Amino acid sequence: MGREFGNLTRMRHVISYSLSPFEQRAYPHVFTKGIPNVLRRIRESFFRVVPQFVVFYLIYTWGTEEFERSKRKNPAAYENDK
């Protein structure tokens, strides 16, 4: 290779296209097309994703409360002690 970047050796049967940094736009249509597309995708996948998170949250909170309850001593077992 031995050449500087941008003037690399030519390869046969390889077509490459380039665009000047002055001709390209960094974020074209981000606000006009990008954000509405994100909102549309969230709205479409809401009912596929949210129920699973709700079920996971309910199971997690139940398990945490049950674990904390099982760590406590039962006061009824010690009523006859002096």
Swiss-Prot record:
<comment type="subunit">
    <text>Component of the ubiquinol-cytochrome c oxidoreductase (cytochrome b-c1 complex, complex III, CIII), a multisubunit enzyme composed of 11 subunits. The complex is composed of 3 respiratory subunits cytochrome b, cytochrome c1 and Rieske protein UQCRFS1, 2 core protein subunits UQCRC1/QCR1 and UQCRC2/QCR2, and 6 low-molecular weight protein subunits UQCRH/QCR6, UQCRB/QCR7, UQCRQ/QCR8, UQCR10/QCR9, UQCR11/QCR10 and subunit 9, the cleavage product of Rieske protein UQCRFS1.</text>
</comment>
<dbReference type="GO" id="GO:0021539">
    <property type="term" value="P:subthalamus development"/>
</dbReference>
<protein>
    <recommendedName>
        <fullName>Cytochrome b-c1 complex subunit 8</fullName>
    </recommendedName>
</protein>
<dbReference type="GO" id="GO:0021680">
    <property type="term" value="P:cerebellar Purkinje cell layer development"/>
</dbReference>
<dbReference type="GO" id="GO:0021548">
    <property type="term" value="P:pons development"/>
</dbReference>
<keyword id="KW-0472">Membrane</keyword>
<comment type="similarity">
    <text>Belongs to the UQCRQ/QCR8 family.</text>
</comment>
<dbReference type="GO" id="GO:0045333">
    <property type="term" value="P:cellular respiration"/>
</dbReference>
<dbReference type="GO" id="GO:0021766">
    <property type="term" value="P:hippocampus development"/>
</dbReference>
<dbReference type="Pfam" id="PF02939">
    <property type="entry name" value="UcrQ"/>
</dbReference>
<dbReference type="GO" id="GO:0006122">
    <property type="term" value="P:mitochondrial electron transport, ubiquinol to cytochrome c"/>
</dbReference>
<keyword id="KW-1274">Primary mitochondrial disease</keyword>
<dbReference type="GO" id="GO:0005739">
    <property type="term" value="C:mitochondrion"/>
</dbReference>
<dbReference type="GO" id="GO:0021854">
    <property type="term" value="P:hypothalamus development"/>
</dbReference>
<dbReference type="GO" id="GO:0005743">
    <property type="term" value="C:mitochondrial inner membrane"/>
</dbReference>
<dbReference type="GO" id="GO:0021794">
    <property type="term" value="P:thalamus development"/>
</dbReference>
<feature type="modified residue" description="N6-acetyllysine; alternate">
    <location>
        <position position="33"/>
    </location>
</feature>
<feature type="modified residue" description="N6-succinyllysine; alternate">
    <location>
        <position position="33"/>
    </location>
</feature>
<dbReference type="InterPro" id="IPR036642">
    <property type="entry name" value="Cyt_bc1_su8_sf"/>
</dbReference>
<keyword id="KW-0999">Mitochondrion inner membrane</keyword>
<keyword id="KW-0496">Mitochondrion</keyword>
<dbReference type="InterPro" id="IPR004205">
    <property type="entry name" value="Cyt_bc1_su8"/>
</dbReference>
<feature type="topological domain" description="Mitochondrial matrix">
    <location>
        <begin position="2"/>
        <end position="39"/>
    </location>
</feature>
<keyword id="KW-0225">Disease variant</keyword>
<comment type="function">
    <text>Component of the ubiquinol-cytochrome c oxidoreductase, a multisubunit transmembrane complex that is part of the mitochondrial electron transport chain which drives oxidative phosphorylation.</text>
</comment>
<dbReference type="GO" id="GO:0021860">
    <property type="term" value="P:pyramidal neuron development"/>
</dbReference>
<keyword id="KW-0007">Acetylation</keyword>
<keyword id="KW-1133">Transmembrane helix</keyword>
<dbReference type="GO" id="GO:0030901">
    <property type="term" value="P:midbrain development"/>
</dbReference>
<feature type="transmembrane region" description="Helical">
    <location>
        <begin position="40"/>
        <end position="68"/>
    </location>
</feature>
<dbReference type="GO" id="GO:0045275">
    <property type="term" value="C:respiratory chain complex III"/>
</dbReference>
<feature type="topological domain" description="Mitochondrial intermembrane">
    <location>
        <begin position="69"/>
        <end position="82"/>
    </location>
</feature>
<keyword id="KW-0679">Respiratory chain</keyword>
<keyword id="KW-0813">Transport</keyword>
<keyword id="KW-0249">Electron transport</keyword>
<keyword id="KW-0812">Transmembrane</keyword>
<feature type="modified residue" description="Phosphoserine">
    <location>
        <position position="16"/>
    </location>
</feature>
<keyword id="KW-0597">Phosphoprotein</keyword>
